[in-house]
Amino acid sequence: GLGDVYKRQHEVTGSCHFLQCQDKRILVDCGMEQGPDLYVNQEIPVNASNIDYVFVTHAHIDHSGLLPLLYSHGFRGQIFATTATSELCNIMLKDSAHIQMFEAEWRNRKARRAGLPEVVPLYDMDDAQGVLEHFVPCDYNKIIEICDGVKIRFVDAGHLLGSSSIEVWLTEEDKTVKIVFSGDIGHGNKPLIKNPQFIDEADYVLIESTYGDRIHADPPDYAPELAAVIKRTFARGGNLVIPAFSVGRTQEMLYHLRRIKTEHLLPEFEDFEAYIDSPLAVEATNIFHKSVEDCFSDEAKKLVEQGINPIGFPGLKTSVTSDESKMINFSKKPLVIISASGMCEAGRIRHHLKHNLWRPESTILFVGYQVPGTLGHALLNGAKEVKLFGENIQVHAEILNLPGIS
């Protein structure tokens, strides 16, 4: 039997499918809805303690984000995912728990002042740590016998480091059915990671459709475009602020920035500095470095073999502590600042926006999809004033979107 656990029409819903084979109950993905309200519609409509296995296509929160909630509701089964997905979930689920607790604390201060009921975080750090112990890291392209009647294989989906489509074979009463879960599939030619692999046959295929209504042309060459934006911004004396998801998009931007340096695309500002200001992005970048053999594209592997770090360059700095983060805003020279979260709903990016949105010389460059209702969406749609940390901030900076990168 097969069921879709969530049937809601929202912008980026959490992905979750339910399978039953003989007496085994299985979830494929267990994602959290993304958007401005963390506390709406985030229930798990299955009995968590009855679930035997979870198969995870990739680490993005809309596919993995409710795993700690599943654990807190009693799940103690095994979670199968690729090695890179397991490692990324290790940082992303803990980060998600941290955001939950921070967000709940902030909301509750407001609620207490208004005499309203308090919210409880969906899960805490103990739930995130607990569920991570149930992960079983798997290799690509190997058939794995899960239990009697259930076999799976992870195939590279080319969407994110470690991402996969999952082939599932279910056998009941000598009849075998093959179901393929596409996961999110990359559209090829991404920097760093391999192109999606093909799957030849299946009885049933479930396909993700977040961008299903769009035809993706071949991606443009981003390095020259990015160089032009940096040149224009630095010539004005401003900073280039890039809100970016810590995992995946940040590393892609580092790849393009490295090309700008190595190919001398910005002769006027050859020695420019760039900051990654997100502890999660710094950890994720380290996981990318470890995953060269399994996940990198041939082009990226060649660079590594030549002793070139595909996502590193002179002038790249990382800030992990909040003091280091604050110092960025006291720099006298123009900087490229990559920070999270990508939709500007939380995280250090909000501090950088506070310091740069009012400056006509600065540029805010969006490089990912913006859910309606988020601060990022409002800025892209021409908001003239936004509220940050209780202050009204005028928007005078140049607001740009890098098309086709989503």
Language-model segments: residues:
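Short, small-residue-biased leader/transition segments that mark boundaries at the very start
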Residues: 1-6
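Pre-active-site segment of Zn-dependent metallo-hydrolases
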Residues: 11-12, 21-77, 81-135, 185-195, ...
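Short beta-strand scaffold segments in enzyme catalytic cores
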Residues: 14-19, 163-168
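Beta-strand-turn-beta hairpins that frame and shape the catalytic cleft
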Residues: 21-25, 143-153, 171-179, 395
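Active-site neighborhood of phospho(di)ester-bond hydrolases with catalytic His/Asp-centered motifs
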Residues: 28-30, 51-60, 64-67, 79-82, ...
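Metallo-beta-lactamase
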Residues: 96-160, 293-332
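Cap/insert and terminal regions of metallo-dependent hydrolase folds
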Residues: 165, 178, 186-277, 363-368, ...
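Hard-cation-handling environments
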Residues: 229-377, 387
